[in-house]
Amino acid sequence: MNSAVIELFRHHVNNIPNILPHQLATLDYLVRSIIDENKSVLLFHIMGSGKTIIALLFALVASRFKKVYILVPNINILKIFNYSMDVVINLFNADYILENIFIYSTTSFYSINYNDNVINYNGLSRYNNAIFIIDEAHNIFGNNTGELMTVIKNKNKIPFLLLSGSPITNTPITLSNIISLMSDEEINFGDIIIQGKKVFQILLNEHGVNVLKNILKGRISYYKMPDTDLPGIQYHGKSFLDTRVVYCNMSKLQEKDYINVRKMCNNEMFEKNMNNVSLAVLGQLNLINNLDILFQEQDKELYPNLKINNGVLYGEELVTLNISSKFKYFITKIESLKGKHFIYFSNSTYGGLIIKYIMLSNGYSEYNGSQGTHPKLIHGRPKTFAIVTSKMKASLEDLLVTYNSLANDDGSQIMFLFSSNIMSESYTLKEVRNIWFMTIPDTFSQYNQILGRSIRKFSYKDITQPVNVYLLAAVYSDFNDTIESLDDYSLEEINTLPFDIKKLLYLKFKTKETNRIYSILENISDSYTQPPHPHIVEIVLGEIVRQFFYHHSRIKHNDERLLAAVKSVLTNTEAAKKYIKEIVDGHFFVSNKVFDKSLLYMYNDEIITVPFKLSHEPFVWGVNFRKEYNVVSSP
């Protein structure tokens, strides 16, 4: 990124509508690399740094020269991008051609480029002289979308902007797909890795390090937001390597069925049933391992105090919770905790069923759904929970608007938000005070993404109060090992450990190599010092003006401070004065610390900030802003 751009904003104010300095500095780099040099770029910015805003700023700049295609993982994230586009346009002080920007979910993009599951090669010519932006790029490979991107890259010879906060999802091999999309180099990955017996024993050898540096040099933008303006994180549980884990010792009932299921697994690290019984056991249903039966059984007894009928669980066991050491800990602990909770779990069908009926049986009511038994209250209202899965029919955006609203800062509208993997990417949560992992994530990048979505800058009123993190592991009734090093166990001994502990150790092994590669990517990230690129000068100037008038409500028209600020980019005095006149005559929008939302006006020999607000008469129900006078009202 362009360090000179960051230097322009040493005392940047972030609590107003703005473009952050690192976003402008990265935009400068993208314009130089992708538009000027036609190179592909990996935007490796850690979660919470505003990759979406950077991508959309770049799309608007690039739209003046080329068509821009943006691919996002699903329809819900598509809505987020469309909303964010409106936000970015309001801050964008330059020309753009919105008709040249196309945003698709991967499924809809697939549908317009395939006929009967075969790529329509004749239609790919539409992507000539285009730019592709791919959100969460690490997730598009291994499916038809990844295949299509590779074909477009080879056929159309166009650049890609790949967005990822975690380009290695599982092992270093996953990075190979990103490299292949960014470069024309042919790589034999057998030559650059060391492969052990286990999946986590995949290491980049010395030759691989050199290949990585040579191919990606000049194609990486790395950034991690400073940890300032964030609450502290309080990890709970027993010390476990460099983190903490809550050991949830199983009851004899759970342990018995857990062991029986484990004996049935051929490769337990890849079988959902081990995740299931680590969360909770459901008797014979776990042995059958067929989730469809969950919704077919009629009054089937699972345990003496637990039955299932047409997908509904009922019985005293949902309160005593011998079926789940994790939920026994969770239900007991939440009684004493304040604020909102975010709870991650996997296997949405199995997990969603268990969560719903345990919560209802323990007095927590379903948001817009069933009321809990003897409902627990907050401010006279039921304490509610919501379960988010990829299958949910209701609008996820509406649910998150309620969860993130100021009125819900204390959790009085939705206190508990349970979610499967869908929430690990692209969504933002606010005022989360308690984060729970009911299932061990498949990768530590997923674990970090969930933390990143939940603990965000500018999302907390009070950063002096810590955020609690609970990583729960189901362990045997007599297990209490303290694990301080990855060398504490041999591979054979690891296989005898509780499944959750074994999975955590595997993830830590893989994370060690992932962090080594991330360090390499960080070191080859491009950094330089130059004046802002001509294509982004107006955008940079707009942010300079916004920052200046946050502090100043009224100045002389020839104020030297404003002139100096503008001349930091426009070195010519006459050009700077002309620019100032244009923004005042055009009533530039700013946010002032006294008047809030304001427009610039000339009054006698002064430039003043004039507050405004949009209002309407009660009978007005629609306004078409494309016509000067077109107010639709009732008779």
UniProtKB/Swiss-Prot annotation:
Parts forming coiled coils: none
Enzyme category, top tier: hydrolase
Span of domain Helicase C-terminal: 326-505
Keyword Nucleotide-binding appears in the UniProt entry: yes
All residue ranges annotated as the Helicase ATP-binding domain in the record: 32-185
A GO CC annotation given for this chain: virion component
Compartments, as annotated in UniProt: Virion
Residues the entry annotates as binding ATP: 45-52
Keyword annotations: Activator, ATP-binding, DNA-binding, Helicase, Hydrolase, Nucleotide-binding, Transcription, Transcription regulation, Virion
Top-rank lineage group of the source organism: Viruses
Motif extent (DEXH box): 135-138
SMART domains on file: DEXDc
Gene3D superfamilies with a match to the protein in the record: P-loop containing nucleotide triphosphate hydrolases (3.40.50.300)
PROSITE patterns (UniProt xref): DEAH_ATP_HELICASE (PS00690), HELICASE_ATP_BIND_1 (PS51192), HELICASE_CTER (PS51194)
Pfam families xrefs: Helicase_C, ResIII
Documented EC number(s): 3.6.4.-
One MF annotation (Gene Ontology) recorded for this entry: ATP binding
Subunit structure: Heterodimer of a 70 kDa and a 82 kDa subunit. Part of the early transcription complex composed of ETF, RAP94, and the DNA-directed RNA polymerase.
Family: Belongs to the helicase family. VETF subfamily.
Function, in words: Acts with RNA polymerase to initiate transcription from early gene promoters. Is recruited by the RPO-associated protein of 94 kDa (RAP94) to form the early transcription complex, which also contains the core RNA polymerase. ETF heterodimer binds to early gene promoters.
Protein known as: Early transcription factor 70 kDa subunit
